Curated annotation (Swiss-Prot):
Subcellular location: Cytoplasm
Cofactor, how bound (note): Binds 1 pyridoxal phosphate per subunit.
UniProt cofactor(s): pyridoxal 5'-phosphate
Location, primary (coarse class): cytoplasm
Function noted in UniProt: Catalyzes the reversible conversion of 3-phosphohydroxypyruvate to phosphoserine and of 3-hydroxy-2-oxo-4-phosphonooxybutanoate to phosphohydroxythreonine.
Cytoplasm as UniProt keyword: yes
Record flagged with keyword Amino-acid biosynthesis: yes
Protein name: Phosphoserine aminotransferase
């Protein structure tokens, strides 16, 4: 078997090798059933066990109270940009929601919600600014909470707590009451830092995460919603995307992505075995500090994000001489460092160092960064 490269993809991303090995070992025969998980009825006893166990493990990892429903859905984070407003805007006589726009994904969330109601921007990082005497370009900073303007009659306030492309991260979420809107629930897209650190989900009415970054393979989306927010879907909402239906049938209202849920459940067990979410946080802090420390000490590379809001998961950086980009990527692949190219909307490079990336992978990247700088600096 060839040595596995270090995979820095933003998603679908690297999975823990132990999870892949277990899935491979059980591919043809899950626990003596004689069937692959891919062949099981989603209503049969075997898959019901898999699905219920995954939910129980997730609840344990997050310390979720009973008044939150857990749903394993389809459509990805982008799909939730439509599913959320179709489910929550019906809470108000006039469909409306507010958005904190801090990058690519929250911009798309705001735009999509506008198809279903009045979507307004409560705060934005779309313009350049100056912070602590340092110039910050658009999408490299976060608007202070005291500048947010939230309507008291909004159905919800949306934010993306980790912008995968821009590499900015909210470490804390505000209490809507502190914004003068105590009846406006917080909706948070946590896709790219889900399970990477403790999150105060009790402050949110709903969170969602595409699994393909920290929680599993592409194809399943985790939605965690306070139960009092269910049952308000707009008439236009398809029944399969109505949270009330999905929650009532324990994620089996229609055929769910069974194999993706199974693998995700294995990831949950892997996280539990490695110290839970606190264990992930400690490892992720160490990786991020190591990588940012090197970038900040280099005159050859640069990370554009305001240091106080840098993501631990997604680290964008640019070469001072962009004419070297292609050579950098070719050399990285030859060294076994894969998928470092930045998103097409911003260019440059990006290292996504999710839970499954060990410290050794980050050190291998830094070793390559040093060598490339030595040869081209």
């Amino acid at each position: 078997m060839m040595a596995r490269p270090w995979n820095f993809s933003a998603g679908p991303s690297a999975l823990p090798e132990a999870v892949l090995q277990q899935a491979a070992a059980e591919m043809l025969d899950w626990h003596g059933s004689g069937m692959s998980v891919m062949e099981m009825s989603h209503r049969g006893k075997h898959f019901v066990q898999i699905c219920d166990e995954a939910e129980a493990d997730l609840r344990e990892l997050l310390g979720l109270p009973a008044d939150y429903a857990v749903m394993f859905m389809q459509g990805g984070g982008l799909g939730e940009n439509a599913i959320v407003p179709m489910n929550l805007m019906g809470r108000r006589s006039t469909p409306a929601a507010d958005f904190v726009v801090t990058g690519h994904w929250s911009t798309r969330s705001h735009k999509e919600a506008g198809r279903y109601g009045d979507a307004q921007i409560a705060a934005s990082a779309a313009e350049a600014t100056e912070i602590d005497g340092q110039a910050q370009s658009s999408w490299t900073w976060l608007p202070p909470v005291d500048t947010w303007r939230v309507r008291k009659d909004s159905a919800y306030l949306h934010l993306c707590s980790n912008e995968t492309i821009g590499g900015v991260e909210f470490t804390e979420w505000p209490d809507p009451a502190s914004l003068g809107a105590p009846d406006v629930p917080l909706v948070v897209d946590v896709s790219s830092h889900f399970l990477s650190r403790p999150l105060d989900i009790a402050r949110a009415g709903l969170v969602f995460a595409g699994a393909q970054k920290n929680a599993g393979p592409a194809g399943v989306t985790v939605v965690i919603a306070r139960r009092d927010l269910l049952g308000h879907a707009l008439p236009i909402c398809p029944s399969a995307f109505d949270y009330a239906n999905v929650a009532a049938d324990h994620s089996r209202y229609n055929t769910p992505p069974t194999f993706a849920i199974y693998v995700m459940g294995l990831v949950f067990k892997w996280i539990k075995a490695h110290g839970g979410v606190r264990g992930m946080e400690e490892a992720n802090r160490a990786k991020a500090e190591l990588l940012y420390g090197y970038l900040d000490g280099s005159a050859f590379y640069r990370n554009p994000v305001q240091p106080a809001v840098r993501s631990r998961m997604n680290v964008p950086f640019v070469l001072r001489d962009e004419s070297l980009n292609d050579a950098f990527l070719q050399g990285a692949e030859a060294a076994g460092l894969m998928q470092l190219k930045g998103h097409k909307s911003v260019g440059g490079m990006r290292a996504s160092i999710y839970n499954a990336m060990p410290l050794a992978g980050v050190q291998a990247l830094i070793d390559y960064l040093k060598e490339f700088e030595r040869r081209h600096g």
